Amino acid sequence: MMSNDLFSKWLGIEIISIKKGYCKLSSTISKDMTNGFNLAHGGICYSLADSCFAFTANSLGKISLTKSAEISYLKKVELNDTIFAECKQNQKNSNVFAVNVFNQKKEEIALFKGIAHFTNKDWL
């Protein structure tokens, strides 16, 4: 999936681990990811969490699409921070996924919740 995901590549997202029902990603905040306050734009954290959610849901074997997603920001993210997103399937056959986002100091910076729609199409 990552090989076709140009947006995740553009963000510099790196896969740390991916297996059935689990994914962990990272990204380092560069100058072009900051807002007018020289902090990471909120969309960067959201996008990392969204990609982590998508990779986790699709790792289950069926092509999945996002039905809904939301994020709560807990801490600011600064230039040169490395942020991590970790997602695991909560319950077998569940379509609700939680993604925890934290920084290199292991401080939780955001909570993301996504609801997936699973299609009948298999991932090849």
Please report, for each region that a protein language model flagged, where it lies by residue.
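Catalytic strand-loop segment that frames the active site of acyl-thioester-processing enzymes
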Residues: 7-40
